[in-house]
Swiss-Prot record:
The record marks 35, 95, 176, 272, 274, 279, 295 as: Interacts with tRNA. One of its GO terms (molecular function) is flavin adenine dinucleotide binding. Belongs to the Dus family. DusC subfamily. Coiled coil: none annotated. The active site is at 98 (proton donor). Gene3D superfamilies: Aldolase class I, Dihydrouridine synthase, C-terminal recognition domain. Its cofactor is FMN. It catalyses: 5,6-dihydrouridine(16) in tRNA + NADP(+) = uridine(16) in tRNA + NADPH + H(+); 5,6-dihydrouridine(16) in tRNA + NAD(+) = uridine(16) in tRNA + NADH + H(+). Its EC number is 1.3.1.-. This is tRNA-dihydrouridine(16) synthase. Signal peptide: none annotated. SUPFAM superfamilies: FMN-linked oxidoreductases. It is an enzyme of class 1 (oxidoreductase).
Amino acid sequence: MRVVLGPMEGVLDHLMRQILTEINDYDLCVTEFVRVIDQVLPDHVFHRLCPELMQGSQTTSGVPVHVQLLGQEPHWMAENAIRAAELGARGIDLNFGCPAKMVNKSKGGAALLQHPELIHSVVKACRDAVPANIPVSAKIRLGWENPEDCFEIVDAIQSAGANELTVHARTKQGGYKASEIKWEYINKIRERFSIPLIANGEIWNFEDGQRCIETTGVDSLMVCRGAFNIPNLGNMVKHNHTPMVWSDVVDLLIYYSKFEMKGDKGLYYPNRVKQWFAYLRQSYPEANELFREIRTFNKAAPIVEHIQRYRDELQSRQSQVA
C-alpha cells in the first residue's frame, strides 16, 4: 500500500509536512497550490510554498514533495511547470479539484471539471513541457455536479499523457459530506482506463482504507483533513497503528512551537496552532479544554506556556492513576 499526504491550502505548509512526515510513513507529499495566472512566477514564490526544493525536493525525513500548480491557461501552466522543474521539483501536480468558491470564481480548481477539453490542454501542455523523467499528475473530483462526468474528465487527462491521477470520490457540489462519497466510481474508472490512480476521500482509519481499497481496487490512498484530526493517521491507514494518544499530541503541539516562519512577526504559531485545534477537537474531546485556555492569546510564548503547564498537569494526573 502507498499512502500520500495530500495538499490542503492554507493548512498543510512545509512545516506541517516536516512534522507529519517525521511521525508517519508517508510515500509522497504535495504542496499547497501555486496559483498561476498570466506570468512565470518568481523563484521566491516556489521556494515559499516549497522550500523543500532547496533540499532535493524532499522533507527532512526524506519523503518526496511534488509541486502543485493551479490555473487554467495552458501556456502559463506549462511555463511555470518548467520553472518548478528547473528549481528541482520531483513532480508536478495539477489541481482540478479545489472546491473553494474564490478559486472556482476565478475559473480555477474544480471549475475546470465543467471543461474537460481545457483540462486536456493544460495537462498536455505541462506534460509536453517538462522532462519525461518528471511525473505530471492531476487531482480531480468526480465532476461538478454529476459523477458520471468523471469518465470524460479522466479520458481528457489520460489522453493528454498524465502519469498519475488522484480522484476525490465526490463531486464539487458534494462538498465534504460523508454521504456524498462514491468510491465505486473510482473502481469504474480503474476498469475503463489504464492511468495509475490514487483514491481520496473519507479515509479516517485503517478500516476505511481497507474498505476503500476493496471497493476501488486501488492500493494507493491519499489522506488530507484526517491527517490533522489524528496526527499519525498515515501510520494508522498504512500499518494499522492505534491513534496517537492525547498526551503525545500535546507534546507534538509543543514541538510545533519550535518552528517559526521568517518575516511573519511571530504570528505564525498562534494562528496555525489554533487552526490545528479546529481539527484536533473533532477527534480528541480533551482538546476543547486546552483550546479554551489559549484561544484569546495572539503570541506564541503564552500559548506554549499554557500548553506546557497543561502537559505537566496531565503527566501528574497520569502518574497518580498509575
